[in-house]
Amino acid sequence: MEFAMKKHAQEWIAEIEQMFKETFPKAEEMLQTIVVEFAPARNWNRKREKAAQLCGEETSKQQQIKNNLACKHDVPIYGEFIFGEKGQAILLRTEVLDRRGIFAEVLFHELAHGYCYWLEKQDKNFPVECQLGRCENEETQLGYYVWKEFIAQTISLKICQEKQIKVCKYTDGELKAYLTWMIKGTFTESDMGMFCAEFFFTDGNDKRLSEMMKNQDELITDDVRQIYHLLSQKLREKDYEKANGKFLMQLGECVARFRLDKLTQRLFNAQKNLQRAS
């Protein structure tokens, strides 16, 4: 990165970290432990591996990330929070420096990951094995995957809104297409978390959700509505950024039912098509 661009980036980082501290004063200690690095798209994998080694990231986590990247090779990665026994780092795509709004949204998102990771470590009752995908309770693990992306993006969008930083909002049509894709196609729990955050940010409510779910299977509609209400209640809490094992398990149970009902509906439709063809 050129010197002028690097200086420019450091100024932005300092401003954004200050805004984050104003929203979450307790984050100051966490911010002192995180290093922010940049990598262009062409060198992302190599730079990520180096950062992971410096942070002491567990091999299993590195493999999990590689598998995720392989599944979503056409989806650009703009940032990532990396953690391990030696430290924490945030890796950002150099290209995000082209637009301040995108840069702020991405960095707030990764800082939120770092802050929530720090909060989880402070909580003796939190199932920290979720952080490495090792929770024995499958529902709790599923809930954590949805939650960590939902809360990171929610925090990012909230701060951007409070600080009047312009970000790209999803339209109703885009959100409906996103939801339909999750219902009809293959999705990850992270995708669901991001959808829910974007839906709430666009003043999503029960009525709008019902309109988006028109003509969908009744069981699937009920599953999505339960996830919506669970997250909606969580956001009304004073310390909404903190989660516990009970909440994660409840969320994960809803997600597991959604996946099962999706599969049931797909098999039912396939059977109907076979009957029509015969």
Question: Residue locations for each model-derived region?
Answer:
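Active-site scaffold of zinc-dependent metalloenzymes
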Residues: E57-L107, L111, Y117-W118
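Post-HEXXH active-site segment of zinc metalloproteases
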Residues: G101-I102, Y117-F150
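Short helix/loop segments within enzyme catalytic domains
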Residues: I155-M182
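Pan-zinc metallopeptidase signature
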Residues: G173-S278
